[in-house]
């Protein structure tokens, strides 16, 4: 089981407009302590939108 202090935890990325959780990825907590935000394609909206790390 993954520890809560894991260096590379799994995170989900949610679309900022429609709030659907479309992507699962990993991030390095030491390099990116803040919330991750990427511009990715949202299949629900049909366009490229900003996706933020959700809890």
Swiss-Prot record:
Gene3D superfamilies: Ribosomal protein L33. The keyword Transmembrane does not apply. GO terms for molecular function: structural constituent of ribosome. Belongs to the bacterial ribosomal protein bL33 family. Pfam families: Ribosomal_L33. GO terms for biological process: translation. GO terms for cellular component: cytoplasm; ribonucleoprotein complex; ribosome. Keywords: Ribonucleoprotein, Ribosomal protein. This is Large ribosomal subunit protein bL33A.
């Amino acid at each position: 089981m993954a520890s809560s202090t894991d260096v590379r935890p799994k995170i989900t990325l949610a679309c900022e407009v429609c709030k659907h959780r479309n992507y699962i990825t990993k991030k390095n907590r030491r390099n990116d302590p803040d919330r991750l935000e990427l511009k990715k394609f949202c299949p629900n909206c049909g366009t490229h939108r900003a996706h933020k790390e959700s809890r």
